[in-house]
UniProtKB/Swiss-Prot annotation:
Family per record: Belongs to the methyltransferase superfamily. RsmH family.
Cellular component GO terms held in the UniProt record: cytoplasm; cytosol
UniProt keyword list: Cytoplasm, Methyltransferase, rRNA processing, S-adenosyl-L-methionine, Transferase
Protein name according to UniProt: Ribosomal RNA small subunit methyltransferase H
Known function: Specifically methylates the N4 position of cytidine in position 1402 (C1402) of 16S rRNA. In vitro, active on the assembled 30S subunit, but not naked 16S rRNA or 70S ribosomes.
Binding site for S-adenosyl-L-methionine: G35, G36, H37, D55, F79, D101, Q108
EC annotation from Swiss-Prot or TrEMBL: 2.1.1.199
GO biological process entries: rRNA base methylation
MF terms (GO), sorted A to Z: protein homodimerization activity; rRNA (cytosine-N4-)-methyltransferase activity
Gene: rsmH
Cystine bridges: none
Length: 313
């Protein structure tokens, strides 16, 4: 049964304003969540406008199905497949804006049964879509120690990754972990130096969650697809919550804002240069939440909004 967990949408107005909504435009909300961005987009669309929302969380889909609006449709699936969804609807090159609000949502964190939080004891799951793939518990019980250490180091930037991985494997040999509290306790015991501002399990939980949900690969694929589906002048409005996400978004926007890089002195005709094409995006900058928003919603503190526009190239 789905509880009514409160969710405060971060950078709500800024992210939607970044789309530069046209009343008759076609937009994608790739991370519906609890519908904060979608509802604001719908309020700015005219009768001819359309909004396609995507989410892989069944609880988000249940919320989306309560929206009775002919301009709105919801897809249960990963946003990495947005290119397929757009192609199926014959909308390639016709999308006027894509919004992505990355990472885990407050309702997912606050619901102990989802297994995302070390602050609330629940099943060690962490899947955005609990109907697909391996849970965190299943992966940790079958993965090699070296693989766990790599994930913790790469996706959690955890400096004690090897020690924690060893402790996880040893604990699972004795008795397989199935609860978030068990993992949090194992990590805390294996961490020799504690950060007084951060729970010792913070980085491990982030890393395992990112790995279980292939989050960074999802982002990279969605960004790649966006170039094909956006209309000239179409906008990308993307909110990230940690450096790994933001690094991917920043690099993508920077690289596609430069156009093809031709080595100095390489002899090329004007025709050859035309075939290489020009830049595909124009980066429009970044925004961060103000002090007032952070005070009202501490989880907004680390968020970064980046906006870019598709060029005619």
């Amino acid at each position: 049964m789905m509880e009514n967990y409160k969710h405060t949408t971060v950078l709500l107005d800024e992210a939607v304003n970044g789309l530069n909504i046209r009343p008759d435009g076609i937009y994608i909300d790739g991370t519906f969540g609890r519908g904060g961005h979608s509802r604001l987009i719908l309020s700015q669309l005219g009768e001819e406008g359309r909004l396609l929302a995507i989410d892989r969380d069944p609880q988000a889909i249940a919320v989306a199905k309560t929206i009775d609006d002919p301009r709105f449709s919801i897809i249960h699936g990963p946003f990495s497949a947005l290119g397929e969804y757009v192609a199926e609807r014959d909308l390639i090159g016709k999308i006027d804006g894509i919004l992505l609000d990355l990472g885990v949502s407050s309702p997912q964190l606050d619901d102990a049964e989802r297994g995302f939080s070390f602050m609330r004891d629940g099943p060690l799951d962490m899947r955005m879509d609990p109907t697909r793939g391996q849970s965190a518990a299943e992966w940790l019980q079958t993965a090699e120690e070296a693989d766990i250490a790599w994930v913790l180091k790469t996706y959690g930037e955890e400096r004690f990754a090897k020690r924690i991985a060893r402790a996880i494997v040893e604990r699972n040999r004795e008795q397989p972990m199935t609860r978030t509290k068990e993992l949090a306790e194992v990590v805390a015991a294996a961490t020799p130096v504690k950060d007084k501002f951060k729970h010792p399990a913070t980085r491990t939980f982030q890393a395992v969650r990112i790995w279980v949900n292939s989050e960074l690969e999802e982002i990279e694929q969605a960004l790649k697809s966006s170039l094909n589906v956006l209309a000239p002048g179409g906008r990308l409005s993307i909110i990230s919550f940690h450096s790994l996400e933001d690094r991917i978004v920043k690099r993508f926007m920077r690289e596609n804002s430069r156009g093809p890089q031709v080595p100095a002195g390489l002899p090329m005709t004007e025709e050859q240069l035309k075939k290489l094409g020009g830049r595909q995006l124009r980066a429009l900058g970044k925004l961060m939440p103000g002090e007032e928003e952070v005070a009202e919603n501490p989880r907004a503190r680390s968020s970064v909004l980046r906006i870019a526009e598709r060029t005619n190239a």
